[in-house]
C-alpha cells in the first residue's frame, strides 16, 4: 500500500539513514515482492538531495568524509560480489549518497551495519518464516523491528520469536 511504502522510505532514508533505528533490512514475502520493490524504487528516484534545512530536500549529507567513503566502498563491494544494487543516479555530490537498495539472499550477506541511506531487501517465502527469524536472531543486530502484515497471528508469532529491543 501507499502508506506502507511511505513508512519504508521514511524509516530507511530520513536523516540520510544515519539513525541507529533506521530501517536497514526490509524482508518482503515473495507474493508482494515485485510490486512493492517497484514502488519503492520509483519513490527513491524522486528523492532530492541537499541541505536538510530546505523544506523540499529529502536526503541530507553524510556526517563526514570518512563515513561517505566507507558507504561508497560498501556499495562498490556489494556490486563486486554480484549483488543487485539499485541507486538512482543523479548529480555527483561530495557530501551525499543517493538512496540505495541492495538485494540480498540472506541476512548474513550484510557484513557490518551501514549508517547511511542504504536499504537491504530480502525476499522470503511464507513457509521460510522460522528460518528468517533465526537469521535475524543470529545477526547480532536487533535494536528495532517493524512488522507489517494483515494477518495478526503472523505478526504475533514473528514478534514473539524475534530477539529484538523494540517492535
Feature annotation, model-predicted:
Residues 1-105, 127-130:
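ALDH superfamily catalytic-core signature
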Residues 80, 96-167:
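Conserved C-terminal structural/oligomerization subdomain of aldehyde/semialdehyde dehydrogenase
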Amino acid at each position: 500500500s501507499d502508506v506502507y511504502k511511505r513508512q519504508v522510505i521514511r524509516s530507511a532514508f530520513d536523516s540520510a539513514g544515519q539513525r541507529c533505528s533506521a530501517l536497514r533490512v526490509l524482508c518482503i514475502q515473495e507474493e508482494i515482492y515485485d510490486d512493492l520493490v517497484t514502488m519503492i524504487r520509483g519513490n527513491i528516484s524522486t528523492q532530492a538531495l541537499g541541505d536538510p534545512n530546505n523544506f523540499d530536500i529529502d536526503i541530507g549529507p553524510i556526517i563526514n568524509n570518512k563515513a561517505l567513503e566507507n558507504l561508497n566502498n560498501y556499495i562498490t563491494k556489494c556490486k563486486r560480489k554480484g549483488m543487485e544494487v539499485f541507486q538512482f543516479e543523479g548529480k555527483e555530490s561530495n557530501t551525499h549518497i543517493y538512496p540505495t537498495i541492495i538485494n540480498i539472499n540472506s541476512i548474513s550477506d550484510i557484513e557490518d551495519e551501514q549508517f547511511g541511506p542504504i536499504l537491504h531487501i530480502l525476499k522470503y517465502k511464507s513457509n521460510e518464516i522460522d528460518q528468517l527469524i533465526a537469521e535475524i536472531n543470529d545477526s547480532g543486530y536487533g535494536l528495532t523491528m517493524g512488522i507489517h502484515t494483515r494477518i495478526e497471528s503472523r505478526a504475533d508469532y514473528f514478534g514473539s520469536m524475534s530477539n529484538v529491543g523494540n517492535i
